[in-house]
């Protein structure tokens, strides 16, 4: 396995960005934002949940504390591709992420009831999570194309752009590829700003000048809500997700 960061503690702010806004950001970022380790990649995730979707239902209520478990790869995996099993928690607006790396086949076996390839504090936390949430199982596949940047003058500041966000609930095996139904309009991407403290003044100014405002958006949550609407309305397949100027999602 390659070297990787296993723990994160930071604020994460999300923004839904149009193509025009993205172009303006690209110009503003050119002098100081550079690609990170993964640069451009297709990220594939399997989110785990209980049969009644207890985790995502609670998350959508926006409680003070919430958590989720996912399996992640940075390309369509083979058996020996590096994969990450991650617990992501949010408490009082701070995000805590803890993850362990292993091969994709090892991750599948582990999450199917096996033992972690190596024991650690993080693996014990994941073991507890799997034990606590009875019946937890693969629930949804979410994939997207990511551009990941960091500030060369303030390396702890990271900005990611996720486009082509797609989801599926069948064939929950990342080795099957990244196909799925698209979640957002084609000209909209999700930008996330990840930083240990407050947003730098220069970045806040860029966001303000381009009328880019934070929003509450969860890929898994939005896909789950879409799934519910589809299951309740046979006509939903012809509807389109729209986003207003505040970043709120509605269908029409």
Outline where the language-model segments fall:
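Phosphate-end processing signature that detects enzymes handling 5′-triphosphorylated RNA
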Residues: 1-252
């Amino acid at each position: 396995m390659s070297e990787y960061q296993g723990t994160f503690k930071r604020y994460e702010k999300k923004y839904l960005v149009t193509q025009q806004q993205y172009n303006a950001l690209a110009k503003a970022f050119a002098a100081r934002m550079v690609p990170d380790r993964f640069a451009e990649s297709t990220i594939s995730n399997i989110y785990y949940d209980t049969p009644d979707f207890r985790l995502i239902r609670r998350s959508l209520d926006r409680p003070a504390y919430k958590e989720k478990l996912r399996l992640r790869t940075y390309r369509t995996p083979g058996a020996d591709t590096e994969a990450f099993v991650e617990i992501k928690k949010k408490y009082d607006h701070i995000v805590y992420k803890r993850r362990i790396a292993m091969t994709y086949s090892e991750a599948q076996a582990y999450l199917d009831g096996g033992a972690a390839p190596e024991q650690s504090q993080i693996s014990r936390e994941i073991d507890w999570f799997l034990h606590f949430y009875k019946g937890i199982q693969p629930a949804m596949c979410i994939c997207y194309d990511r551009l990941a940047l960091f500030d060369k003058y303030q390396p702890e500041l990271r900005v990611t752009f996720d486009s082509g966000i797609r989801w599926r609930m069948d064939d929950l095996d990342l080795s099957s590829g990244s196909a799925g139904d698209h979640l957002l309009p084609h000209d909209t991407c999700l930008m996330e700003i990840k930083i240990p403290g407050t947003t730098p003044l220069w970045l806040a100014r860029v966001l303000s000048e381009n009328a880019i405002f934070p929003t509450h958006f969860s890929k898994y949550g939005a896909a789950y809500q879409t799934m519910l609407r589809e299951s309740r309305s046979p006509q939903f397949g012809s509807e389109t997700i729209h986003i207003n100027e505040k970043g709120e999602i509605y269908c029409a």
